Design a protein with these regions (language model features):
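Short amphipathic beta-strand segments in non-cytosolic proteins
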Residues: 73-88, 175-189
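Short tyrosine-centred short linear motifs in exposed loops/low-complexity segments
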Residues: 1-5, 41, 56, 93-97, ...
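Beta-strand-rich interaction surfaces with strong enrichment in secreted/lumenal proteins
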Residues: 35, 86-89, 100, 146, ...
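Short S/T/G/P-enriched beta-strand
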Residues: 4, 9-63, 108, 116-164, ...
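Calcium-regulated, polybasic anionic-phospholipid
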Residues: 56-79, 168-178
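Short beta-strand/loop motifs in extracellular/secreted proteins, especially
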Residues: 4, 71-75, 107-109, 172-176, ...
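Hydrophobic beta-strand positions in extracellular immunoglobulin-like domains
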Residues: 50, 101-103, 159-161, 202-204
Length: 246
């Protein structure tokens, strides 16, 4: 029995010096957004739990694990994509390391989680940051039809829905209204392109200066009202109503 205990202690000692297993817990620790998909401006957190290959449950030998991680260069997390972000790392005990970051630019990122100079299993991860909710103050309008037009000729301009961080929305559904006031008053028609872009169209038959009032859900976007000048169209001479002489 004494010999067995000695052998067991020797085995445990060798295992304590072996490489632990690193287990990624994706999204299950998320306080807001998830690691693989989230929204601009959302706080994201995810956890890694580390245990020795001989441990019966997560967190066994937590302080030893922490010391092992520190001796191997510690964990780090860097996101590369539309911009580069460095996540904060906090040790919460029992072999659990939590990563925190907040992306504000929408797009595709690669999330590289490293221990020292080497990636943990599964890293780098693909992460998609979607635009946040539409922010009326960040929406914009542009195009020649917002500045000038020719009487009797259809004119157009674009409306772009954006979130608080200026990311263009990737879907439609926003409620815009374009009202023109001047020598005559009328509304423009709006086409939803279902990608965050909207096309406003109108055909003004009377020359003059107009205010273009552009609202989303009743709230003016930045720059509204815009000043529009409608000029006379091309001159057309009278048609010849006299029969040709023989």
């Amino acid at each position: 029995m004494r010999n067995y205990n000695w052998q067991h202690q020797q085995l445990m000692s060798r295992q304590m010096q072996s490489t632990p297993l690193v287990i990624c817990v994706l999204d299950k620790f998320a306080s807001g957004g998830g690691l693989l998909r989230t929204y601009a401006g959302q706080d994201v957190s995810f956890a890694l739990q580390v245990k020795y290959s001989f441990a019966g449950h997560l967190g066994e030998g937590g302080e030893d694990l922490r010391n092992w991680v520190e001796s191997n260069g510690n964990f780090s997390c860097v996101l590369t994509g539309p911009t580069t972000l460095q996540a904060d790392v906090v040790y919460q005990g029992a072999g659990t390391f939590v990563f925190f970051y907040k992306p504000v630019l929408a797009g595709k990122y690669l999330v590289s989680v490293r221990l020292g100079s080497g990636d943990v299993p599964g890293s780098p991860f693909e992460s998609y940051v979607e635009p946040g909710a539409t922010d009326t103050a960040a929406c914009s309008a542009s195009g020649l039809g917002l500045l000038c037009a020719e009487a009797g000729v259809e004119a157009t301009f674009n409306i772009i829905s954006r979130d608080h961080y200026k990311n263009q929305r990737t879907c439609g559904g926003d409620n815009y209204e374009v009202a023109l006031t001047g020598p005559v008053c009328f509304n423009a028609s709006i086409t939803d392109c279902n990608n965050g872009r909207y096309i406003a169209k109108y055909n003004c038959i009377m020359c003059g200066d107009y205010y273009v009032n552009l609202r989303r859900d009743g709230v003016p976007i930045t720059g509204s009202p815009f000043v529009l000048s409608v000029v006379a169209g091309k001159t057309h001479g009278p048609r010849n109503k006299f029969p040709k002489s023989s």
